[in-house]
Amino acid sequence: MALDEVKITRAIVESYLESFLKCTDVDVALVGAGPANLVAAKRLAEADVRVVLFEKRLSVGGGLWGGGMMFPRIVVQKEACRILDEYDIWYREFEEGYYVADSIEVVAKLTAGAIDAGAELINLVSVEDVMIREGDRIVGLVINWTAADMAGIHVDPLAIRARVVIDGTGHDAAVCRVVQKKIPGAIVGESGVIGEKPMWAALGEKIVVDATREVYPGLIVAGMAATTVAAGPRMGPIFGGMLLSGEKAASIALEKLAQSVD
């Protein structure tokens, strides 16, 4: 068979647009494809929720790839090992309570898990604003190509509708900061987006899970973004809290969706 370059082009464009159009009206839109949101996306998709996950970079995985200081290993505490088991991720006990996993395997399998469950992942797309309705409730996202932002060119964005948004943008807490900046009087969380504190692994791992919650009508925060909003300390290359945070964020989102139906 002779290959036709134009057919290759059409196959890519038509199939992508078909998928993209399905993502313009979803139940849950997740921003930032780090470990917390990858776990959340899988949980939500398994519950037959329409899910799209936007990542501004070329690659997904957030800070997982580099492990600790470019050593591709991460540490997970015992209570989160069950999530690694769910994805068939290999790990070993280093010392009591400290389990080590290959960071690249973790990224690959978390990503595959979300996709296999039915979540749609879209990379190279940035979220620059939110969409609101009565009472300034968040009802969607305003998106644009990351390349347009990097090039500094003015291109009007597009919008997608979502019943719930999850900010998993890491240290930036980007969606939360947009809400705080652009909605008069908006208070994200208890005191607004304060920013993270210096490292304290034990406390940071607790706070990242405790701080995973709805912080503004229609907006849930997960992972390091939750820590940033709650002014918790960073925790470094231990990722159990991130995985548990994603699990909790999905559970909260499902509760919110059920309430909106009622």
Swiss-Prot record:
- Binding-site list for Fe cation: D156, H171
One Gene Ontology term of the biological-process aspect is: thiazole biosynthetic process
Q: What is its EC number?
A: 2.4.2.59
Q: What is its cofactor?
A: Fe(2+)
Which of UniProt's keywords are assigned here?
Answer: Iron, Metal-binding, NAD, Thiamine biosynthesis, Transferase
Q: Where does glycine bind?
A: R234
- Provide the catalytic activity annotation: hydrogen sulfide + glycine + NAD(+) = ADP-5-ethyl-4-methylthiazole-2-carboxylate + nicotinamide + 3 H2O + H(+)
Has UniProt tagged this entry with the keyword Metal-binding? yes
Query: Which residue positions does the secretion signal occupy?
Result: none
Name the family.
Belongs to the THI4 family.
What exactly does this protein do?
Involved in the biosynthesis of the thiazole moiety of thiamine. Catalyzes the conversion of NAD and glycine to adenosine diphosphate 5-(2-hydroxyethyl)-4-methylthiazole-2-carboxylate (ADT), an adenylated thiazole intermediate, using free sulfide as a source of sulfur.
Q: Which NCBIfam families match?
A: sulfide-dependent adenosine diphosphate thiazole synthase (TIGR00292)
The name this protein carries in UniProt is Thiamine thiazole synthase
What organism does the record attribute this protein to?
Answer: Methanothrix thermoacetophila (strain DSM 6194 / JCM 14653 / NBRC 101360 / PT) (Methanosaeta thermophila)
